[in-house]
Amino acid sequence: MIHSIKRHQFLLLFMIILMCSPALPALARILTSPLSQSVCEKLAPSFEAELARFNAQLGDPIFIRIFKESNELEVWIKGGKQYSLFKTYEICSYSGELGPKQQEGDRQSPEGFYFVQSNHLNPFSSFHLSFNIGYPNNYDKAYGRTGSALMVHGSCVSIGCFAMTDPKVEEIYTLAEAALKNSQPFFRVHIFPFRMTAENMARHKHSKWIKFWENLKEGYDLFEMDRVPPDTTVKQKKYVFDTDDRYTKAISNRSYSAKISQVR
């Protein structure tokens, strides 16, 4: 028993060193700071037990979804073939109204499908810790949209970013940094105006952004179907999803179910 406890403590210490070290050659080279390292070392032990419930560990791939209307940021963790919802964080502050960001200085938070690479992390942020979501993406550029440095960060002040407070961003940042260090080349950040249910879409059907949101809903539905974030590209000013026929099958299944219901 004592030997087992010591072995567990050794493995935990090794994991903390592995995930929180600034310069292990086997890991991706990621900019760190004394703050990001101390935060990682502080949170790693508690994350071990929490992530184990999802058959996951610190450094496994993550996926983030943001919903403006309900002020929610979800962190999903991949412990097997699919992602599981790890935690939902309340967004302290974001800017503007429902709808996409269009230009620099409009004080509007973006919507769409983005991804974060290791060079998007900022451990020296003026807002505690932060990462750039990658706005503008190819879709935004196709519409001539401008803006820069759109972040998920600490504090509770936003001029286009998603401000989470310092304690919450510490957790989100540590999970993101560990995943990128552990060979996830990037993680996706999907930003929606609201949960893209049929009821919510109907409630907003008169919005000038409804066509844009219908395009976002395609990607939302794919993830809801099998808990795997779809690969996303932009063609002819639209988001296009590499579905492996997932979306087509889902539509067919829903149509079939609807016909059965009508017969009954």
Model-derived features: positions:
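Bacterial N-terminal signal peptides that target proteins for export
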Residues: 2-12
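Bacterial N-terminal signal peptides
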Residues: 12-22
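Sec/Tat signal peptide C-region and signal peptidase I cleavage site
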Residues: 23-28
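Cell wall/extracellular polymer interaction/catalysis modules
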Residues: 29-158, 170-181, 187, 196-264
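Active-site nucleophilic cysteine motif
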Residues: 161
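Short internal beta-strands
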Residues: 190-192
